[in-house]
Design a protein with these regions (language model features):
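Charge-dense, helix-prone N-terminal extensions
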Residues: 1-132
Length: 132
């Protein structure tokens, strides 16, 4: 049997969430893909406790990682500590030396422009690394 593409696997992860979290992850996914068409969808870190894996978006390295939590959808930026956040949308993992994250809760509105700016900043960090 042929393994599903990363995109199909993320579709399945979204479908399993029948509440607002699935809708939010779908919205975030669309925003990420619109920010830069060269961003690649992947599913990583499959394990017995999480057989479906974790949605990851990359471009010359990981850009952001999605987690569906009990009461939130978290978007983690592995290099977030190196990124400027003028709109202050990072709201968790603020003490980490490397990562920053955004927890989205039910009913939250998202600043799409600020989030797209963070995504593009993460892409820039990764692509600059490649040019050195």
């Amino acid at each position: 049997m042929e393994e599903k593409s990363a995109s199909q696997q993320i579709d399945d992860i979204i479908k399993v969430q029948s509440d607002w979290r699935g809708k939010k992850l779908s919205q975030l996914r669309s925003l990420i893909k619109k920010a830069d068409p060269a961003i690649v969808e992947e599913v990583k870190w499959k394990k017995p406790s999480r057989p479906e894996g974790v949605p990851v978006w990359s471009h010359d390295g990981n850009i952001c990682i999605a987690d569906i939590l009990k009461n939130a959808v978290r978007l983690t930026f592995p290099k977030g500590a190196q990124m400027k956040d003028p709109k202050k949308i990072f709201n968790t993992r603020l003490d980490s030396k490397t990562v920053r994250a955004i927890d989205f809760f039910e009913g939250d509105s998202s600043d799409s422009a600020a989030l797209q700016a963070l995504i593009l900043s993460a892409v820039k960090l990764n692509t600059q690394k490649e040019r050195r």
